[in-house]
Amino acid sequence: MSTSAVLFLLLAVFAAGASAATFNIKNNCGSTIWPAGIPVGGGFELGSGQTSSINVPAGTQAGRIWARTGCSFNGGSGSCQTGDCGGQLSCSLSGRPPATLAEFTIGGGSTQDFYDISVIDGFNLAMDFSCSTGDALQCRDPSCPPPQAYQHPNDVATHACSGNNNYQITFCP
């Protein structure tokens, strides 16, 4: 069997074990927020009480979603009081602290996803983060304890979820 055929078969097996995930993002805050995500999701405006979804492909590693606050944009450029990412509406780099982070890897364990909340970069908004078949994580203030959220790099706060699931992130739950 040729090398390219073996490579194709390996990729097909890996792809069969991991699926994309939908992240539903809800704004329960009393004001508009601007969710951002890397390496997928970019950034967008989300009014109070609104929900939006982003699709995250299988194989996404070290993904992050956070809410920016106090933003002003004109033509895709501007600034935010918290979580700003270089003055751009659509982020391609991490947000400036403070920012409460939803972190994830989709299909990182072949048939498992991994997810957590982190306040290592500071806390700007309360957050709930859940997998449709896993643990519901809650971080309501800057001192949310492990295993609910990472406060320090050596904390144990990563949770596993079987693949083929969707996620819910709620800001200001």
UniProtKB/Swiss-Prot annotation:
Gene3D superfamilies, sorted = Thaumatin (2.60.110.10)
Task: Please list which residues make up the signal peptide.
Answer: 1-20
> Key word Ligase present in the record?
no
Q: What's the superkingdom here? A: Eukaryota
Transmembrane parts of this sequence: none
Biological-process GO terms, alphabetical:
defense response
The answer to whether keyword Signal applies is yes
Q: By its UniProt entry, which Pfam families does this protein fall under? A: Thaumatin
Q: Which CDD domains match?
A: TLP-P
Keywords, alphabetical? Pathogenesis-related protein, Plant defense, Signal
Report the InterPro entries cross-referenced here: Osmotin/thaumatin-like_sf, Thaumatin, Thaumatin_CS
The family line of this record is: Belongs to the thaumatin family.
The protein here is known as Pathogenesis-related protein 1C
Q: Which organism is it from?
A: Hordeum vulgare
- Lineage from the top down? Eukaryota, Viridiplantae, Streptophyta, Embryophyta, Tracheophyta
